[in-house]
């Protein structure tokens, strides 16, 4: 066997049907497009969601909800991430400096995920009840 003699197994590659090559081909004349109408024409397509003039689904359904402008700048931090930080005072600036939160973050919430093994002081961050209990159990404190 040589690289220049490689070829697919017999019958594994079926050649595609050619369009518009006579009645006997099965795809002659109209070439699988049917008779008349927009989609039979060259360049004729209908936009996604078009239902033939009937009110389309995306217009029948009501609008609801909105995108929170605060959510874009809010982040969550796990206790395990705080534990890995070298500083004793945890605030927004310390988290940004350690690249734990995005530089654009304006609000950070500490959540109970992982463990904290040392005493830290959390300043100016939102903290869940479970996370607050875990921080206090480790000898730390939470300040507003």
Curated annotation (Swiss-Prot):
Any transmembrane segments, and where?
A: none
> Which SUPFAM superfamilies does this chain map to?
Ribosomal proteins L15p and L18e
- Locations of Gly residues compositional bias? 21-31
For this protein, the record's Pfam families field holds: Ribosomal_L27A
One GO term of the biological process aspect? translation
Q: Where is this region: Disordered?
A: 1-60
Q: Does the keyword Phosphoprotein apply?
A: no
The entry's cellular-component GO terms read: cytosolic large ribosomal subunit
Tell me yes or no: is Ribonucleoprotein among this UniProt entry's keywords. yes
Question: Any S-S bridges, and between which cysteines?
Answer: none
What terms describe the molecular function in GO for this protein?
rRNA binding; structural constituent of ribosome
Family from the record? Belongs to the universal ribosomal protein uL15 family.
Give a short account of what the protein does.
Answer: Binds to the 23S rRNA.
**What is said about its interaction partners and assembly?**
Part of the 50S ribosomal subunit.
Q: What is this protein called?
A: Large ribosomal subunit protein uL15
Q: Which organism is it from?
A: Hahella chejuensis (strain KCTC 2396)
């Amino acid at each position: 066997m040589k690289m220049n003699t490689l070829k697919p197994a017999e019958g594994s590659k079926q050649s595609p049907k050619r369009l518009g090559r006579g009645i006997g081909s099965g795809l002659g004349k109209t070439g699988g497009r049917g008779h008349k109408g927009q989609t039979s024409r060259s360049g004729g397509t209908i936009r996604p969601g078009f239902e033939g003039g009937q009110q389309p689904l995306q217009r029948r359904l009501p609008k609801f909800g909105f995108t929170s402008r605060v959510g874009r700048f809010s982040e969550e931090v796990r206790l395990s991430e705080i534990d890995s930080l070298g500083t004793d005072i945890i605030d927004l600036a310390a988290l940004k400096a350690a690249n734990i939160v995005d530089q654009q973050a304006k609000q950070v919430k500490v959540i109970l995920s992982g463990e904290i093994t040392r005493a830290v002081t959390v300043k100016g961050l939102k903290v869940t009840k479970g996370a607050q209990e875990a921080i206090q159990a480790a000898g730390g404190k939470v300040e507003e």
